[in-house]
């Protein structure tokens, strides 16, 4: 964006009274630009208000600033991402539970070895543990 040079309309000089059409044109452009900026800021403030409603505030009584809102949103998104990635590691909770049981058996000196995945799956189905989702 190139720098704006002050015009005669800005200076309030005698030329304003000599060329009212230029002055009115500049005023209309300035009013239109101000209206666009006001509308942009209202949209931005509305977006921040909506973000504040979905981001946990953890006991804050005062309204969060824009900066604080962005920081809280970032922390919240990262926490949700961690939860999802941790949940992704435990796709099959029955097998995870079974692996924990086998680990316990191995530490006690009982080692079970299966030659095929079918035998392992049969063993898995014989356990009565059922995962209950939240």
Curated annotation (Swiss-Prot):
<keyword id="KW-0539">Nucleus</keyword>
<keyword id="KW-0804">Transcription</keyword>
<dbReference type="InterPro" id="IPR011598">
    <property type="entry name" value="bHLH_dom"/>
</dbReference>
<dbReference type="GO" id="GO:0005634">
    <property type="term" value="C:nucleus"/>
</dbReference>
<keyword id="KW-0238">DNA-binding</keyword>
<dbReference type="GO" id="GO:0006357">
    <property type="term" value="P:regulation of transcription by RNA polymerase II"/>
</dbReference>
<dbReference type="GO" id="GO:0051726">
    <property type="term" value="P:regulation of cell cycle"/>
</dbReference>
<keyword id="KW-0221">Differentiation</keyword>
<dbReference type="GO" id="GO:0010842">
    <property type="term" value="P:retina layer formation"/>
</dbReference>
<keyword id="KW-0805">Transcription regulation</keyword>
<dbReference type="GO" id="GO:0007346">
    <property type="term" value="P:regulation of mitotic cell cycle"/>
</dbReference>
<dbReference type="GO" id="GO:0030424">
    <property type="term" value="C:axon"/>
</dbReference>
<dbReference type="GO" id="GO:0036269">
    <property type="term" value="P:swimming behavior"/>
</dbReference>
<dbReference type="InterPro" id="IPR036638">
    <property type="entry name" value="HLH_DNA-bd_sf"/>
</dbReference>
<dbReference type="GO" id="GO:1902336">
    <property type="term" value="P:positive regulation of retinal ganglion cell axon guidance"/>
</dbReference>
<dbReference type="GO" id="GO:0048663">
    <property type="term" value="P:neuron fate commitment"/>
</dbReference>
<dbReference type="GO" id="GO:0007423">
    <property type="term" value="P:sensory organ development"/>
</dbReference>
<dbReference type="GO" id="GO:0070888">
    <property type="term" value="F:E-box binding"/>
</dbReference>
<keyword id="KW-0217">Developmental protein</keyword>
<dbReference type="GO" id="GO:0043473">
    <property type="term" value="P:pigmentation"/>
</dbReference>
<dbReference type="GO" id="GO:0050769">
    <property type="term" value="P:positive regulation of neurogenesis"/>
</dbReference>
<feature type="domain" description="bHLH">
    <location>
        <begin position="28"/>
        <end position="80"/>
    </location>
</feature>
<dbReference type="GO" id="GO:0003407">
    <property type="term" value="P:neural retina development"/>
</dbReference>
<dbReference type="Pfam" id="PF00010">
    <property type="entry name" value="HLH"/>
</dbReference>
<dbReference type="GO" id="GO:0043204">
    <property type="term" value="C:perikaryon"/>
</dbReference>
<dbReference type="GO" id="GO:0046983">
    <property type="term" value="F:protein dimerization activity"/>
</dbReference>
<dbReference type="InterPro" id="IPR050359">
    <property type="entry name" value="bHLH_transcription_factors"/>
</dbReference>
<comment type="function">
    <text>Transcription factor that binds to DNA at the consensus sequence 5'-CAG[GC]TG-3'. Involved in the differentiation of retinal ganglion cells, photoreceptor population and optic nerve development. Required for retinal circadian rhythm photoentrainment.</text>
</comment>
<dbReference type="GO" id="GO:0060041">
    <property type="term" value="P:retina development in camera-type eye"/>
</dbReference>
<dbReference type="GO" id="GO:0061564">
    <property type="term" value="P:axon development"/>
</dbReference>
<dbReference type="InterPro" id="IPR032663">
    <property type="entry name" value="ATOH7_bHLH"/>
</dbReference>
<keyword id="KW-0966">Cell projection</keyword>
<protein>
    <recommendedName>
        <fullName>Transcription factor atoh7</fullName>
    </recommendedName>
</protein>
<dbReference type="GO" id="GO:0045165">
    <property type="term" value="P:cell fate commitment"/>
</dbReference>
<feature type="compositionally biased region" description="Basic and acidic residues">
    <location>
        <begin position="15"/>
        <end position="27"/>
    </location>
</feature>
<dbReference type="GO" id="GO:0001654">
    <property type="term" value="P:eye development"/>
</dbReference>
<keyword id="KW-0524">Neurogenesis</keyword>
<dbReference type="GO" id="GO:0000976">
    <property type="term" value="F:transcription cis-regulatory region binding"/>
</dbReference>
<dbReference type="GO" id="GO:0043010">
    <property type="term" value="P:camera-type eye development"/>
</dbReference>
<dbReference type="GO" id="GO:0045944">
    <property type="term" value="P:positive regulation of transcription by RNA polymerase II"/>
</dbReference>
<dbReference type="GO" id="GO:0000981">
    <property type="term" value="F:DNA-binding transcription factor activity, RNA polymerase II-specific"/>
</dbReference>
<feature type="region of interest" description="Disordered">
    <location>
        <begin position="1"/>
        <end position="27"/>
    </location>
</feature>
């Amino acid at each position: 964006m190139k720098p704006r040079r002050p015009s005669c309309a800005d200076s309030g000089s005698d030329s304003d009274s000599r060329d009212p059409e230029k002055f009115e044109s500049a005023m209309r452009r300035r009013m239109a630009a101000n209206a666009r900026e006001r509308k942009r800021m209202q949209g931005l403030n509305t977006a921040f208000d909506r973000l504040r409603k979905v981001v946990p505030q953890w006991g804050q009584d005062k309204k969060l600033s824009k900066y604080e809102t962005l920081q809280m949103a970032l922390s919240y998104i990262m926490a949700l991402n961690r939860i999802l990635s941790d949940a992704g590691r435990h796709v099959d909770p029955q097998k995870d539970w079974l692996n924990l049981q086998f680990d316990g058996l191995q530490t006690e000196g009982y080692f079970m070895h299966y030659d095929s995945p079918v035998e392992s799956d049969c063993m898995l189905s014989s356990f009565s543990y059922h995962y209950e989702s939240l």
